């Protein structure tokens, strides 16, 4: 926070003299000291075409935005009707625009790195552990289990004289890999269970220990480990133990292990045995499954990818039968596979049943060029409760009976849920074609729904004040939670969504400011709740497909600010675009385009959002410090109304889903601010939570 109490996003360093001169030099080509207005207008259109090449309804140059409107906007910010403006006069006008300097963004990026370097070893370790610790602990559990069973078998067969005398080095390699394969396949199959993850996610601490957001990455990684161990296991038998066991000079040792009826035992007999055939067929199918799971195959035909995964059922069956002969030890693999296989099999049978026998009536509607909206009623026979932030698997029989795709539940009011779907893939593009052209009118379709899975951040509802920091698509579940909270608030307090009369005298002007402004503490209702929502993306395109959701929140916030005497739900949306533009002209015009909002089109021409867009990396140290000072003011108001609140702890939840370096900074800052709350007696506590979604 600035020394004068300004918010971090208002405490900016404006364009330096060098940057202003560089911008003017780009306009003053002939060096005559005059800036041609037509050149300014041309440059504005050129930069807009570079930044927003596919105009959407909110863009500056859409069909309904007249040339006169653009001309008036340019004349207004330039502040002159001259066609040729003196360079010095134009320079002063550029400075009056108060555009942030490019250097400040670079300094913020450097500050984030130096902040962590300046931390002491203990503080750095605590911050690192807060972000990565539970995930590391889980991976350590998986690896230690693999090592434990692998080493157990290694020692057993290496020290067993009769094993190596009969089957040589191959049995040691094969059985060591087999020992490691038991827990590997257990975790591999278990990572495919959606019902288990949904159930366990109800526990915050288990969700911290097991990063469900990385379940797909974990599944791919452990599959690679499994196919490697399985290959080494096969090599150990095919080129080692089978060769040694079929030799005449080793028949005595083989007879002592397998019995006198087991010899003579030629190589082909080992191959044709139950362990040999089941192992080879299972390994071959495993290779086929891996090939059909390659990114190239998945991208070209998702249906082939999903059908390929059906091979896992014969693979698991063969693996369960693989050790039932009990040649060297009692059967073990089947016990490891029984529970996870039963879970996954139950889920898949349920999905097939839902896809073929239970169709859900739904509507689909085009929102913009990148997004469609699917609405459906929750079937009454579903036992799972639907919540915003969860996800469901969606099937559309008109497109495919076998393709199921996961989508986040945007909102869930009553018995109706909504899905906002970005149509940037093959299947989603075909889904868009089911709509009634580009008219925006809803079209009736039938869908299959499997879910819900995952869970919203359960502890989010434990805090009256929360800070949400998300990067890219990771913030999607929280955007759904925000919309859900806002619609419930509208319903409880007769907001715009209830259909109550609105004051329409100046709604556009109000909306142009976007988001919710600061309110005086005395106007807060007893059930006041505040959420600071910081969404960081690399480029503006990432903001477009969620703009409809966030704008619904912004509109409601503006409506309540104007009509309600007391604030009940206060959502403050801050969107940050971090993409760097080294060209000063691009930077300036990007800022001007963001400023261009009219009563007819109050949204940003670049992002489609009502709330102001901030360019550059957010300084979360200043943001959290500013938030702390505001919480002190709010706590003082509570104490003034009720003195007993003085000794009460005031908890703020900080939910993070993004890059680790930002998470470490937030974790460290939360500890420092909590310590500050103890020192100054405010007893404000910041609880850092690394959120995962899957």
Regions found by a protein language model. Name each.
Residues 28-30, 78-80:
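Acidic, divalent-cation-chelating loop motifs in proteins
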Residues 3-7, 108-117, 363-381, 495-519, ...:
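Non-transmembrane, juxtamembrane loop and terminal tail segments
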């Amino acid at each position: 926070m600035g020394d004068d109490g300004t918010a971090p996003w208002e405490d900016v360093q404006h364009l330096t003299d060098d940057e202003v001169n560089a911008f003017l030099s780009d306009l003053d080509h002939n060096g005559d000291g005059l800036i041609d207005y037509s050149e300014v207008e041309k440059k504005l259109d050129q930069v807009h075409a570079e930044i927003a090449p596919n105009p959407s309804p909110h863009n500056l140059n859409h069909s309904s935005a007249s040339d006169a409107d653009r001309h008036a906007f340019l004349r207004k910010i330039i502040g002159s009707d001259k066609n040729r403006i003196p360079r010095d006069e134009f320079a002063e006008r550029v400075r009056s625009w108060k555009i942030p300097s490019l250097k400040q963004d670079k300094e913020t990026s450097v500050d984030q790195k130096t902040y962590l370097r300046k931390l002491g070893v203990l503080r750095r370790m605590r911050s690192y552990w807060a972000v990565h610790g539970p995930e590391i602990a889980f991976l350590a559990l998986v690896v230690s289990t693999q090592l434990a069973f692998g080493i157990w078998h290694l020692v057993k067969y290496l020290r067993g004289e009769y094993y190596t005398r009969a089957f040589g080095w191959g049995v040691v390699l094969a059985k060591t890999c087999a020992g490691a394969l038991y827990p590997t396949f257990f975790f591999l199959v278990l990572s495919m269970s959606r019902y288990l993850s949904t159930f366990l996610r109800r526990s915050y601490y288990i969700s911290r220990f097991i990063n469900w957001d990385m379940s797909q990455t974990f599944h791919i990684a452990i599959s690679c480990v499994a196919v490697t161990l399985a290959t080494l296991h096969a090599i150990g038998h095919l080129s080692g133990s089978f060769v040694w066991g079929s030799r005449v000079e080793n028949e005595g040792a083989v007879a002592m292990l397998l019995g006198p009826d087991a010899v003579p035992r030629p190589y082909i007999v080992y191959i044709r045995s139950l362990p040999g055939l089941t192992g080879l067929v299972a390994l071959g199918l495993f290779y086929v499954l891996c090939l059909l799971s390659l990114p190239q195959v998945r991208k070209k035909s998702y249906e082939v990818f999903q059908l390929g995964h059906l091979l896992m059922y014969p693979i698991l069956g063969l693996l369960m039968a693989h050790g039932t002969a009990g040649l060297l030890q009692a059967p073990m693999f089947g016990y490891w596979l029984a529970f996870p296989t039963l879970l996954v099999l139950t889920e898949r049978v349920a999905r097939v049943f839902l896809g073929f026998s239970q169709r859900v009536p739904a509507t689909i509607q085009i929102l913009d060029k990148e997004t469609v909206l699917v609405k459906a009623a929750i079937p009454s026979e579903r036992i799972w409760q639907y919540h915003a932030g969860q996800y469901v698997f969606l099937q559309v029989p008109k497109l495919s009976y076998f393709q199921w795709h996961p989508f986040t539940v945007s909102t869930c009011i009553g018995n109706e849920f909504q899905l906002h779907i970005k149509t940037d893939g093959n299947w989603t593009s075909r889904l868009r074609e089911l709509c009634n052209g580009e008219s925006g009118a809803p079209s009736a379709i039938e869908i299959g729904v499997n879910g819900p899975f995952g869970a919203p951040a359960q502890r989010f509802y434990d805090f009256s004040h929360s800070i949400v920091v998300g990067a890219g698509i990771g913030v999607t579940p929280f955007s759904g939670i925000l919309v859900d909270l806002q619609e419930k608030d509208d319903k409880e307090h007769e907001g715009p969504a209830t259909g109550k009369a609105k004051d329409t005298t100046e709604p556009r002007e109000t909306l142009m400011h976007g988001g919710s402004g600061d309110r005086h503490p005395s106007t807060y209702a007893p059930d006041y709740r505040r959420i600071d929502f910081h969404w960081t993306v690399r480029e503006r395109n990432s903001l477009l497909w969620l703009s409809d959701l966030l704008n619904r929140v912004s509109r409601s916030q503006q409506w309540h600010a104007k009509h309600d005497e007391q604030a009940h739900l206060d959502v403050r949306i801050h969107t940050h675009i971090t993409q760097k533009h080294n060209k000063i002209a691009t930077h300036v015009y990007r800022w001007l385009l963001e400023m261009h909002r009219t009563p007819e089109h109050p949204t940003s021409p670049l992002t489609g959002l009502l709330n102001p867009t901030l360019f550059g990396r957010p300084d979360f140290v200043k943001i959290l410090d500013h938030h702390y000072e505001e919480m002190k003011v709010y706590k003082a108001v509570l104490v003034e109304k009720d003195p007993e609140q003085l000794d009460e702890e005031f908890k703020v939840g900080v939910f993070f889903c993004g890059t680790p370096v930002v998470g470490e900074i937030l974790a460290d800052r939360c500890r420092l601010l909590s310590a500050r709350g103890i020192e100054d007696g405010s007893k404000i506590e910041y609880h850092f939570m690394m959120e995962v979604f899957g």
